[in-house]
Amino acid sequence: MRAYLTRRRPLLRWLTALALFFTVYLTVRTSRAAMNWLCGGVIFPVMRRISRLCDFFDGSVGEVLLLTGIWAAVIWVACTVRRLATGPRRGAVLADFMLTAGCIALTVYAGFCLLWGTAYNTDGFQEKSGITAQPVSAEALERVTLYFAEELSAAAGEVPRNADGVCAADRKAILAAAGDAYDGIYEEFSFLRMETGRVKPFGCSRALSVLRFTGFYFPFTGEANVNMDSPVAYLPATVCHEMAHQRGIVSEQECSFLGILAATRCTDPVYRYAGWLEGYVRLSNSLYSIDPERCLAIRDTLPEEVRCDLRADSAYWTQFQGAVSQASESVYDAFLKGNGDANGVRSYGMVTDLLVTYFNT
């Protein structure tokens, strides 16, 4: 055993360094002032620069890293299984595998904690803007839902549609227009003005749909990745949501709010339509839970074009319902709660509190 530990001393030293890192991280991350300084002054500026460097590649550098890691892990596991089945010193082989795998997993997790986990205890959009989500009344929720339905109806005729009446906007054009998507809210929220890398299309978008993801922020490259397979009517709102993460906003509730608000203020009609559509869906779901009759009455005012998009979205996501999507949601819920978001995946739906607080004025 002593000889084995001597040979593996570099890995053991690395594990010791990781233990020290996590000790410091768990101790310091509770300090809001320290995290604001670290993230605002060091981590986010560096990651925005890295994300701009990643613009040399039209695709997602993060996706390349993820796929490379997955395939490397598969090959490594296969080789280890072969050595365990046919080679000598199986105990040492298994111990090497477990020790190395532990080092790799903890190193990746340490990187994630440093680049993104620290941000969960920084000032968010609500602290910086002074707009704080408040408990909303049924009457206020109904008013704002009706307002979104009216704006959505007015915007429905401004987007291209296919023969079935479903939104058929060009996905590449949507990504190309993303650079100007936040221009309409910079005057009101100047702290959001900053240079970031381009929003990236995720090549394996079908896999994202299986996991019920429309997009994600990859903290190791600072890239905003979006699902290019899900219904295009909602894509601009997703783009704006992920761009909020690039601006250092961690809360899913706040990013959903900013995604909707930025899209509705955009000069691009496809973005405006997506913003009103996403906001209406969130609001109507909340209204339905407390007053189904009134929710359906508002829905009946929508033009057929909007209903086509609602049906298309429902049909698309229905095909992915199953054990994989449920497991993915459970894991993501645990992840959010583990990083201090007590509402977990429910935080996406809680955007209605911010929407009503902001628009009911």
PLM region descriptions:
Residues 6-12, 87-102:
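Membrane-interfacial entry segments at the cytosolic side of transmembrane helices
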Residues 304-361:
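Pan-zinc metallopeptidase signature
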Residues 117-185:
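Membrane-interface segments at or immediately adjacent to transmembrane helices
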Residues 19-83:
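Membrane-embedded alpha-helical segments of integral membrane proteins
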Residues 72-79, 92-126:
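Transmembrane alpha-helices and immediately adjacent membrane-cytoplasm interface residues
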Residues 139-143, 148, 250-294:
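Post-HExxH zinc-binding segment in Zn-dependent metallohydrolases
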Residues 160-228, 232:
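Auxiliary, metal-adjacent structural segments of Zn-dependent hydrolase domains
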Residues 58, 235-261:
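Active-site recognition of the HExxH zinc-binding catalytic motif
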